[in-house]
Amino acid sequence: MHNQWSEWEKAQAKTLAAQSQYQYGDLPNWPHIASAAKDPNNYISGKAANHAELYAQDFALAKKMGLTSWRFSVEWSRIEPEEGAWNAEAIKYYKAYLAALADAGLEPVVTLFHFTLPVWFAARGGFAKRDNVKYFVRFVDKLMDEIGATVRYVITINEPCV
């Protein structure tokens, strides 16, 4: 078994499970995505790696592998599913997630935008309309008010050139 991780491998480790942490139908915009598909049944992914529930175990495994940080994204549509309506349960989830990272001794690296949008924001034209940036700023302000004290590293946009 290969357990000798190079420094490059440790530095480049990403959390693919975190990108697929939600169960089928769990995201507020899921019905819109599935209904637009040529074959909606082809979009069912089940629980994927079930990272949403097993994150503490995943963090322990990452620490055992020698990782020192954990990059993940915050799902805007969970935090603000309706325009101006903040989801207290979603915020509580991310606070618990960050606490589990701290307990595991992993430095959180938070990505604010990783390609998904709340349905209401997309309906307004998303980022294609310059005036809509104010909604993203409002989301970021709220998020940092809630978790900013526990986070040192923030990535604004995942892969901004994509």
List the model feature ranges, each with a label.
Residues 1-46, 50-51:
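Glycan-binding loop/region signatures in secreted carbohydrate-active enzymes
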